[in-house]
Amino acid sequence: MISLPSLRLAFATALFCSGLAVLAPRAQAAVQLPTGFQDQVLASGLDWPTGIAFLPDGRILVCELQSGRLRMIVNGELAAIDPIGIVDSLATSGGEQGLLGVVADPRWPSKPFIYTLSSALDATLRISRFTAAGDLSDGTSGNLAIVAGSRRELIRDIASVTEVHSGGTLRFGPDSLLYVSLGEDAIACTATDTTKLNGVILRLEVRGLPDTPGPPNKPLLAAAGNPWVTSANINRRLVWEVGLRNPFRFSIDKPTGRLFIADVGFDQFEEVNVTSTGGLNFGWPYLEGTTTFVTNECGIPAPPGLVGPSFKYARTEYCANNCPATIIGGVVLRSVPNSTVTFPASYDGRYLFSDYYTGFIWMLRDSSGTWVKAPVVQGQPSTADWARGYAQASDYVLGPDGAVYYALNGYDFASGSGEVRRIVHDNGNVGLAGRAASRVEFAPVYPSPSRGSASLRFVLPRAARARLAIYDALGRRVRELQPEASLTAGEHLAVWDGRDESGRNVAPGVYMARLGVDGQSFARRIPLVR
């Protein structure tokens, strides 16, 4: 999938020549969207946010790849308890290891469980469950945290010896079963060996597990209807699909139950596999796209019945010199009635995905079972690209409001430059990225953490009396940036230089920016480091 700059050049070169994805540092390009759409930031200052998921009450979970932190976004900002937990004992070398994915139990709040996929220090991947406590039913509360000692291991023996091709997504289907994508660990012949749990999609029954912490119990995870559920081999009982290389991101369309699996290719094709049927073999390593890759791997000839992709794209379609590519699976769009940010109903059933390197978003539609490019809409940056500027996006989810939410790893590998953002359609409510807002908008502090300078942006929907000041952790005012005064409608920017009223540098720590507007109060945290 992705690689951090800590990779040594020789190792990176070797990976690239073998066809694996290696990320070259680059700045984020400007976002280009069709007419009527906007891209908005929800939370900034994150360290390599890799996976996101919604709680059923609308709060957003975020997992950071190498820190192991689980963070939560509430009402457009990081929760008061931050992080809500840390997944420890992570292997983080190489750049594709760490905390890869997160999802919440759909039975929340009666079953307040959070599931993760992570790389462990013993060269394995682990699927774990944690219990949360706090305000479980209040979607506006930041009072939520992982209970210490609540970890239950579901599976902890998935091989991860090569530091790459780990997979990374967990999603619940409309059948309440947990689906998990796992890469082939850069050992191609494991992708067709259903006893290895590599290069597969798992389908797990978690409702029979005890609510308490404990070790794995694989027999309880075997879901009825799995294609090999009667096998004598316990691993085979858990497998839903096989023959995948690195299905880093997939999504499930809840109305239809179909899986949209984005599988990262070797050096020719990236592909999307659409399925609602278990037991399929998507062909790796015998096929890359629809092209024969090998006829025999590890002494095993290609089996019959291989299934080609629902959609594929060649690197040569957008780069004559066969540049790097990594498909990032997106979501199937579903409009939400009365939402001011939902995609229009004309987009219903369409599937969007992006490429981690080039940053394009493509839009697909179902044409009698064949997935093809959707018709061009007004304002697209090109006939091929529905949008541009999404390099380093690492995960997408469809929000309960019909907007598309995504995690952005970061800009040019800068620490703390990761963000969670969303793509919205302007249905009468425009936030920070567009015209004057219909309510006061106070953007997250940038950068976060701040090193001597913090930018504070806010938007007033109309002329109002406003005041902006900085306070320390004890509630003492440190600096007044904007004395109370009448300000015009529109966007305003203030910069705090990390000094107090006397011009002295303040000590490192967490400070609070408080914005008052006509009796209303808004706040943003400023982590300050030196």
Language-model region placement:
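C-terminal tail/sorting-segment detector
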Residues: 454, 480, 485, 495, ...
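Asp-box/WD-like beta-propeller blade repeats and closely related beta-sheet repeat scaffolds
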Residues: 126-171
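Surface loop/turn motifs at the tips and blade-to-blade linkers of beta-strand repeat domains
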Residues: 41-47, 84-94, 155-161, 239-242, ...
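Short, glycine-anchored, charge-dense loop/turn motifs used at functional sites
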Residues: 176, 402, 470-478, 511
